[in-house]
């Protein structure tokens, strides 16, 4: 997870070895999170960008999907994906453009860019929050065959369970909200 600064990060070789295990079905959660910069600048987040690039390369080499987290960092998140190449319409390199932007909280423009790169968009209990009207508008923009729902457990329980520990048992509230849109 992008918030795990200081955690010993596996090398690309480590990731490739781990990904070879039969139970491994994806690479991530990876991405960029600039939400809590505090006194630091975006330049101080180079460790996140380096880690993200390593995970993208692991996905490319293993042909596994990426699980991408982006928060207050969508421009860099998308730019690094594009730099990596191998995306939809790029026949010169092996496709890596599969995976999901999980717990999506960005704009319709970011959703369009992610969809154009071949990714799915997943929404969590946040879409049930009163304050998430803009995000609910994005839900309506995502094609149903590219839309996923999730818990992001143990966080972000949907209304009427907001503030409690989230659980997969609460996914029906997210599905209900999507259906109503």
Label the model's feature ranges.
Residues 1-181:
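Mid-domain alpha/beta scaffold segments of enzyme catalytic cores
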């Amino acid at each position: 997870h992008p918030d795990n600064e200081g955690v010993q990060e596996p090398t690309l070789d480590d990731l490739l070895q781990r990904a070879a295990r039969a139970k491994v079905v994806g690479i991530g959660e990876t991405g960029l999170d600039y939400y809590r910069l505090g006194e630091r600048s975006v330049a101080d987040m180079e460790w996140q960008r380096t880690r993200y690039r390593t995970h993208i390369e692991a996905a490319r080499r293993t042909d596994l999907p990426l699980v991408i987290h982006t928060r207050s960092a969508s421009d860099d998140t998308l730019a690094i994906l594009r730099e990596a190449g191998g995306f939809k319409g790029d026949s010169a390199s092996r496709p890596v453009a599969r995976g999901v932007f999980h717990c999506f909280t960005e704009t319709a423009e970011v959703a369009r860019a992610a969809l154009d790169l071949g990714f799915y968009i997943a929404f969590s209990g946040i879409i049930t929050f009163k304050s998430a009207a803009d995000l609910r508008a994005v839900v309506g923009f995502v094609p149903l065959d590219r839309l996923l729902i999730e818990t992001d457990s143990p966080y972000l329980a949907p209304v009427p369970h907001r503030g409690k520990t989230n659980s997969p048992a609460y996914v029906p509230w997210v599905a209900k909200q999507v259906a109503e849109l």
